[in-house]
Amino acid sequence: MTTLFISDLHLEESRPDITGAFLTFLRDKALGVERLYILGDFFEAWIGDDERTPLQEQVAAALREVRDTGTDIYLMHGNRDFLIGEDFCARAGAILLDDPTVVDLYGTPALLMHGDSLCTADVEYQKFRANMRNPQTVKMLLSRPLKDRQLMARQLREISMAKNQGKAETIMDVTPEEVVKELEAHNVQLMIHGHTHRPAIHELEANGRPARRIVLGDWDENVWWLEASKNQPVALRHQPLADF
């Protein structure tokens, strides 16, 4: 039995190489595994399930094919695709997860998160996040015409890129104290998240015991995934995108 974790693919029409790598990953790595978790920022942008672009339909069909072979697929919102809804998940055969969620990873409780909520030093972003995730805000956004949402997504992306260029790297990384706080709040010793694009396995202490924080990598020059098996230690793996 094997479980795979990925995040931060940022799928978009302008990067067909990443889409192609993902489809190959599904065929070569995900087929036949027990579970596949996608922990946010699966798409570069998502403005509602009603958009239904050729890329989205292609990805949904590919996921459904994997699901139909017996692999359970779980999808968590990221900061760029938090408007993914149940309609897309139904087409893809995926189950939408809350952020955070604790799962049983072969006898070890694991706390799964996208990771943006851990970056508490970026106060401005956390205020923006709280506003955008408010159910009333989400309802208002989805009620607007599709063209308005498409324009808004482009504008927000441009604003985000401009603001991030002026921010210190430390602000955009997780706050160590917040990591410990979440581990202790959920009484677990293992956290898995994405968002920061800084793949690594960190050793720390929480609940008075050793703990680990595993950071998934973004898909750009490399394809990153975490592999967990019943009788093997977790392994953070990567291969050049060009190899897929």
Curated annotation (Swiss-Prot):
Keyword Manganese: yes
Cofactor binding description: Binds 2 Mn(2+) ions per subunit in a binuclear metal center.
Location within or outside the cell: Cell inner membrane
UniProt pathway: Glycolipid biosynthesis; lipid IV(A) biosynthesis; lipid IV(A) from (3R)-3-hydroxytetradecanoyl-[acyl-carrier-protein] and UDP-N-acetyl-alpha-D-glucosamine: step 4/6
Binding-site residues for substrate, renumbered to this chain: 79-80, 122, 160, 164, 167, 195
Gene3D superfamilies, sorted: 3.60.21.10
Keyword vocabulary terms for this entry: Cell inner membrane, Cell membrane, Hydrolase, Lipid A biosynthesis, Lipid biosynthesis, Lipid metabolism, Manganese, Membrane, Metal-binding
BP-aspect Gene Ontology terms: lipid A biosynthetic process
UniProt record similarity statement: Belongs to the LpxH family.
Name by which UniProt lists this protein: UDP-2,3-diacylglucosamine hydrolase
Gene: lpxH
